[in-house]
Amino acid sequence: GWLLAFHPDLLCSTSLGRNIKNYSFFSYHLNEALHLSLREKDKAIECMYNIEKELQHAIDCHSKTLISRYIELLLDYCSRFYDRQFITRNEVNKAILNKMDIALDGYIQSGQLKNGVLPSTKYCADILHLSPRYFSDLLKFETGKNLDEYFQLKRLEVAKEMLLGKGYTVSSVAEKLGYPSVQYFSNLFRKLVGVSPCEYRLSQN
């Protein structure tokens, strides 16, 4: 097997140093690791051989740049392979998102939104037994949205249902769903739906 380890000084003033924070898979749990195909494994080994060959070359003013670029190339391939893995695990990912939706529904029904506390990435990741970074990447890959954006739309759908039900005023909907004020809720609703909450209720009845 292979182990790649490098000193942080290698990152200084390099493209890898500027981009290392973008490789979110460094924060994944062990059970979220890559499952490489044979072709992907060959490509990863090729990258490692290139790094090894450069390390065996006499050190000169280009060594640091070339080694860091080879490492960055390997990490870029890993990003590509993770995208492939997300695609091939489509059904598994859908099941995970269904569990997330159930958890978010429960969070809304619990009344915690009244205190203005929105569900966090860690909250959802813990329920799903995932690392926060893996959960965020999965959600972004499947929906194109981060948790705040996704929950914003989900909360809006719940607001629509409440407006069409009996016993809820616009004010009570805004309060139950944790919006900071009725005016904020009304303005946001109009922006996203195209009509005010009252107009929406009238148009559907």
PLM feature spans:
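A hydrophobic/aromatic-rich effector-binding and dimerization subdomain
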Residues: 1-57
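The DNA-contacting recognition helix of HTH DNA-binding domains
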Residues: 8, 132-133, 181-183
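An amphipathic alpha-helical interaction segment
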Residues: 42-91, 95-102
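DNA-binding recognition helix and immediately preceding turn/loop
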Residues: 96-148, 166-175
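Terminal helix-turn-helix DNA-binding modules in bacterial transcription factors
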Residues: 141-183, 202-205
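…primarily DNA-binding HTH/wHTH and HhH modules…
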Residues: 186-205
